[in-house]
Amino acid sequence: MVEDILAPGLRVVFCGINPGLSSAGTGFPFAHPANRFWKVIYQAGFTDRQLKPQEAQHLLDYRCGVTKLVDRPTVQANEVSKQELHAGGRKLIEKIEDYQPQALAILGKQAYEQGFSQRGAQWGKQTLTIGSTQIWVLPNPSGLSRVSLEKLVEAYRELDQALVVRGL
């Protein structure tokens, strides 16, 4: 089981779709060697060094957290049903209301659209909020994603810079 890494007062909570088998096996988020999450958040400015999956708890030192829409691990995220994503979206809203981070970053358009019953999402900041928490949709850093490392870093950096501008 991959546990959430959450605390009150975070700058951002990154929300993956669901754990892959590598993460489920190790208990650490974004654990597959091909997953670019740790490299991306470092290069985008969220951390001052590239953390390893087993150092995930140190995200809290940077006022960052991690959660997921669906707890069930799969080989590929497309094995998760629309119903699971929708139910996960409802649970996620409750978590965000409890912890009130400044931003929630959903990692993937389809995850956001199905989890929050939205259509036509664009990358970046959304108009929908959860209380005062901004919602951002960022490309998924999975090794299966065709988005280049450069584009991932650019998208994540935009969120980091928006938080910096707000003094966070």
From Swiss-Prot:
<keyword id="KW-0234">DNA repair</keyword>
<keyword id="KW-0227">DNA damage</keyword>
<dbReference type="InterPro" id="IPR036895">
    <property type="entry name" value="Uracil-DNA_glycosylase-like_sf"/>
</dbReference>
<dbReference type="GO" id="GO:0003677">
    <property type="term" value="F:DNA binding"/>
</dbReference>
<protein>
    <recommendedName>
        <fullName>G/U mismatch-specific DNA glycosylase</fullName>
        <ecNumber>3.2.2.28</ecNumber>
    </recommendedName>
</protein>
<comment type="similarity">
    <text>Belongs to the uracil-DNA glycosylase (UDG) superfamily. TDG/mug family.</text>
</comment>
<keyword id="KW-0238">DNA-binding</keyword>
<keyword id="KW-0228">DNA excision</keyword>
<comment type="subunit">
    <text>Binds DNA as a monomer.</text>
</comment>
<dbReference type="GO" id="GO:0006285">
    <property type="term" value="P:base-excision repair, AP site formation"/>
</dbReference>
<dbReference type="GO" id="GO:0005737">
    <property type="term" value="C:cytoplasm"/>
</dbReference>
<dbReference type="InterPro" id="IPR023502">
    <property type="entry name" value="MUG_bact"/>
</dbReference>
<comment type="function">
    <text>Excises ethenocytosine and uracil, which can arise by alkylation or deamination of cytosine, respectively, from the corresponding mispairs with guanine in ds-DNA. It is capable of hydrolyzing the carbon-nitrogen bond between the sugar-phosphate backbone of the DNA and the mispaired base. The complementary strand guanine functions in substrate recognition. Required for DNA damage lesion repair in stationary-phase cells.</text>
</comment>
<dbReference type="GO" id="GO:0008263">
    <property type="term" value="F:pyrimidine-specific mismatch base pair DNA N-glycosylase activity"/>
</dbReference>
<dbReference type="Pfam" id="PF03167">
    <property type="entry name" value="UDG"/>
</dbReference>
<dbReference type="GO" id="GO:0004844">
    <property type="term" value="F:uracil DNA N-glycosylase activity"/>
</dbReference>
<dbReference type="InterPro" id="IPR015637">
    <property type="entry name" value="MUG/TDG"/>
</dbReference>
<dbReference type="InterPro" id="IPR005122">
    <property type="entry name" value="Uracil-DNA_glycosylase-like"/>
</dbReference>
<keyword id="KW-0378">Hydrolase</keyword>
<keyword id="KW-0963">Cytoplasm</keyword>
